[in-house]
């Protein structure tokens, strides 16, 4: 374990193994490729998918997002393993409750979290957009990376060039998660940077 002082008198305990290992190196990609750019990593993902128990489409999305982050924010050091860990915890890589990943990365049916209405230990998060609520202003986390609608509006991106920015697409969601975690120059290659991200 490591102990870091975040402010005078405030200590942050960081367990061993943080940040997690970066995993296998990801091949270089053309971040401006047309179509679904993450598909450039098909062979790499197919070689690892079964052993990692991560669908090929999801693994492509995580690795591509980490590669784009490396280009756009080289000091962030986000690894595809971090994105894969989030994807596993939040939605079993887009397969929670029988959802499936389409070849273009869309998750169907859409994955929604519990109502964030303040009950059962949840925060109460109100949103005025009817499309992301049940009509009562209370929201749910969305998609394979479980974005809160307000966060999605700030960080959502079209990672696979279809003209849509969708939290229900694993490519869009993985790249948005990388952008969110790398925000404000965070360095996820350090224990403190990773734990505070």
Ranges and model annotations:
Residues 1-52:
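N-terminal low-complexity, Pro/Thr-rich disordered segments
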Residues 34, 41-197:
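Catalytic glycan-binding domains that act on GlcNAc-containing polysaccharides
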